[in-house]
């Protein structure tokens, strides 16, 4: 019998699959006991993962012992089926880190040769902070194999469509334009990511910064507290990726309990992650971590819509993983063009379950429109369940971009979002999506932008919004906005009506406004409303109606069983929500079973 959490909104079970491989070949890698002349046996292991790659054919498991592996793993074989997979995993109970970073062992000198003030300033020759201590050094050219992240800009350098302009020209303001022009490489001093600046003189404004010269080799650095280089451990991203198949379309790869760190990759498109499926399908990724990606944490699709492929797609399971400190997006994917028009292509059967997304999307370039802790395009028959998202810098928590169908978003916790849309964002879809049993707390507006919503959609229909908790949203708790889209964005030749935003038994409080619906054809009942900071907190886009609960009920028949309530809450260390409704208190473990705990409120 299928577990109820794997039932899709249309009532069918999710296409769940597992690794049933009986691994006949097992290879071992060990930094402590391995050697470059090893044979990969348990007694004579390899020193590097790369040594195991040529032998890792279908039916092979590569067991990696504890250590820090400074390499990119590039498999040359995929698996054939659930019974013939290729697996890379950490040895049981051991910590394995695969990193794109190298330790800097070069020589520092006093920095010189660059103007210390902005170019137009006359008669001032020192930094704004004259006490600033700036040093210069050069990376080892031999550390960069194939690409040098410090020699490439963030970008993106590809057009989204086949066209004349790459998306870097979406940069709306000076902040955006500086960000896209920065280099992809990152520096880490004593484990802390340093801030890169575009101009040398900016080193004199703040410590813990660095500047890269045009050669991508020479760098100038100001250590924290204007300290000297001695006594610090400095790491630099010599590689973009941690795990990236040598060829496209590999399937049935299993990754387990591996940590990938410090990838100096670029901004999408292309969506090329520190872990990349490289257009593959049927990957099982469990218990893995991606920490510190300059651009993309992991990609599970075809990277950009300019690709053309009729190869299989989707069917990825991402379970119990963590994606943290990723600059643009933690986990993302999209379909490719094929013999079907691009907008009618789909990404089928994706499961993202029990994952953590912490402090992502720190690059302030939201107009790129690919920014989220988790973002997918054209997702079908998929589950996004029981994930924990906290700290989203300039983005949404979960963003499903256009023509999604039969999607369940359930049991997710989303905290502390700053963005143009909301904690959960659904876009341009006219078929069934269910948003149920989620908690969104503290959603704020990106500076000079819209946003600050809990659950947000635009240009959609047929979204079921059920038993969610939305608190402390700077704009709306729940908003389903509607407006016309161009004809070319009509999936399967059909536009969007803005109907059927069925909204039941949600708890919304401490927001400017409570609920907005696209048009009037909806079913709405049983919602519990609390504090709102603006009048007429219940609204409809077209025809426009701004209402209180009394007239919401009277004129539209909404929320016959809904009510206003005295609601207060306390968020304790982002782990517990103490929610009080009309004097009754509920202690919700934000790391526990969210659906069951919310159902208790309505029991």
Stretches found by the model and what they are:
Residues 2-279, 297, 306-310, 341, ...:
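Extracellular polysaccharide-degrading/modifying enzymes targeting complex plant/algal/animal polysaccharides
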Residues 71, 235, 286, 353, ...:
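Acidic-residue sensor for enzyme active/binding pockets
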Residues 74, 81-83, 241-244, 265-278, ...:
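Glycine- and acidic/polar-rich repeat regions and solenoidal domains
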Residues 88-91, 286, 385:
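Beta-strand cores of secreted/periplasmic/IMS beta-sandwich domains, seen most often
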Residues 98, 287, 371:
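Glycine- and aspartate-rich repeat motifs characteristic of hemolysin/RTX-like Ca2+-binding segments
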Residues 277-288:
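Transmembrane beta-barrel wall of Gram-negative outer-membrane proteins
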Residues 321:
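Active-site neighborhoods of metal-dependent hydrolases
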